[in-house]
């Protein structure tokens, strides 16, 4: 809205004695009637949030086959994705694990994926990260397996607050994480730092180092 001073107005419109109280003033109101469009459109474009998390609660199953294709941001206390007993998961989505403490407030976790029992998780793609891990509690596994669980990684990007805990299996368990692809931040899955024979790069694959990232590719 633009207001114009009439061109015929002269110096008599100036305030008396330069006192702002006497300055000319205009008061008006505006009423807008609008119809909401069927699609979003704003200064950021209508696709700026297309990769936003669609799932905001942890997912847990103890049986059956399940596929995750929508991006997640959920509590990582016990795993944003929790595979238990005989459950089987296939993941091709971003999974952001939010640091969460237990009820006592003494211990916390930020696991993107946790597999237990005889479960199996196949990760084909996505971005896996931790959110809000405090500096005084960086010991949080990103991808974790225990029991007899099996995790297979075919692709995706993985970045943990403490890179040494990107992939981990519980000591003394029969769990295993097999890597056939993916990019890992400051973590070499062919030379893991936590436990022997827990994390393995599958035969026919090798690691290529590129800056801060370790990429698993076929021979």
What are these regions (language model features)?
Residues 64-66, 70, 77-79, 85-89, ...:
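The right-handed parallel beta-helix/beta-solenoid scaffold, focusing on the short coil/turn
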Residues 53-58, 155-156, 160, 168-219:
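Extracellular/surface-exposed low-complexity segments
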Residues 34-38, 129, 185:
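Short loop/turn segments at secondary-structure transitions that flank enzyme active sites
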Residues 53-60, 74-82, 100-116, 131-146, ...:
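Extracellular beta-strand/beta-solenoid scaffold signature
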Residues 1-56:
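C-terminal, structured domain-capping segment
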Residues 2-8, 70-73, 94-98, 127:
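Generic short beta-strand segments
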Residues 44-46, 61, 184:
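Acidic Ser/Thr/Pro-rich low-complexity disordered segments
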Residues 40-44, 102-104, 190-191:
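Short acidic, Gly/Pro-enriched loop/turn segments at secondary-structure junctions
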């Amino acid at each position: 809205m633009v207001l114009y001073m009439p061109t015929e107005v002269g110096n008599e419109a100036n305030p008396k004695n330069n006192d702002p109280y006497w300055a000319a003033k205009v008061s008006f109101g505006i009423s807008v009637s609008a119809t909401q469009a069927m699609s979003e459109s704003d200064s950021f474009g209508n696709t700026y949030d297309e990769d936003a998390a669609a799932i905001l609660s942890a997912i847990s199953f103890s049986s059956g086959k399940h596929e995750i294709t929508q991006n997640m941001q959920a509590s990582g206390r016990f795993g944003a994705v929790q595979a238990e007993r005989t459950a089987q998961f296939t993941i091709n989505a971003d999974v952001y694990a939010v640091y969460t403490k237990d009820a006592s407030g003494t211990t916390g976790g930020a696991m993107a994926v946790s597999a237990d029992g005889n479960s199996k998780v196949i990760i084909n793609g996505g971005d896996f990260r931790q959110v809000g891990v405090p500096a005084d509690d960086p010991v949080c596994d990103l991808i974790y397996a225990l029991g007899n669980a099996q995790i297979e990684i075919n692709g995706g990007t993985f970045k943990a607050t403490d890179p040494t805990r990107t992939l981990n299996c519980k000591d003394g368990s029969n769990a295993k994480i097999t890597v056939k692809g993916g990019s890992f931040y400051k973590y070499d899955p062919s030379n893991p730092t936590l436990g022997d024979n827990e994390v393995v790069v599958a035969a026919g694959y090798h690691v290529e180092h590129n800056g801060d990232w370790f990429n698993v590719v076929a021979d």
